[in-house]
Amino acid sequence: METLFVKANDRENSVTGLLYEAFISTYKALNPNDSIVELDLFQEHMPYLNALMIEVNYKAAQGIPLPTSEEEVDHIVKRHLNQFLAADKIVFAFPLWNLTVPAVLHTYLDYLHHPRKTFTYTEEGLVGLLPNKKVALLNARGGVYAEDDRSEMAVSFVKNHLNVFGITDITTVIIEGHNQFPDRSETIIQKGLQKAKQVAKTF
């Protein structure tokens, strides 16, 4: 079993980091035989999606040979795509920054949109090709958001991308309100960390 852990927060002592450590330490202890890969997106060279990358992605999908100048771009995207495809389970840890995800996570998700690899086109529309993958989303946000709050574009954003790939087995662990309610901050955080550990036990 291969499990990929994707972290998208470079702030020291962040609540996202605490969530990540609570989950992965519990998971590792209970799954010693798993192949575990940790990917810290802020430590990666990940150019934003642009016209060149879109063109290279199209050529690669069509099997068109790439010139040397485009091979490096293709390598960056394919390395992350193939790593994602190889994983049976994926854990994402990310904060809500300014109503959405960190730009580096947005870029990572852009890399995963690959026709014939993660989705395909049909007369009825897009069909995801990865229905058997299992995902956990670990999210920290200082305020409190209703489940259908349109201003929350972090967890919902990631879920929408995963749904395009056919992934629906998604578990979420959210710590929220620790900035909005500073008098209860520690209690809120500890409760969320305990939930992360419980989810990790059965993930």
Swiss-Prot record:
Residues spanning the membrane: none
Cofactor note: Binds 1 FMN per subunit.
InterPro entries: Flavodoxin_fold, Flavoprotein-like_sf, FMN-dep_NADH:Q_OxRdtase_AzoR1, NADH:quinone_OxRdtase_FMN_depd
Catalytic activity: 2 a quinone + NADH + H(+) = 2 a 1,4-benzosemiquinone + NAD(+); N,N-dimethyl-1,4-phenylenediamine + anthranilate + 2 NAD(+) = 2-(4-dimethylaminophenyl)diazenylbenzoate + 2 NADH + 2 H(+)
Signal peptide bounds: none
Key words, A-Z: Flavoprotein, FMN, NAD, Oxidoreductase
Cofactor: FMN
Pfam families associated with the record: Flavodoxin_2
GO function term, MF aspect, one: oxidoreductase activity, acting on NAD(P)H, quinone or similar compound as acceptor
Top-level EC class as recorded in UniProt: oxidoreductase
EC number: 1.6.5.-, 1.7.1.17
Domain of life: Bacteria
PANTHER family reported in the protein's UniProt record: FMN-DEPENDENT NADH-AZOREDUCTASE 1, FMN-DEPENDENT NADH:QUINONE OXIDOREDUCTASE
Free-text function comment from the UniProt entry: Quinone reductase that provides resistance to thiol-specific stress caused by electrophilic quinones.
Family indicated by similarity: Belongs to the azoreductase type 1 family.
Oligomeric form and interacting partners: Homodimer.
Protein name according to UniProt: FMN-dependent NADH:quinone oxidoreductase 1
Lineage: Bacteria, Bacillati, Bacillota, Bacilli, Bacillales
Gene name as annotated: azoR1
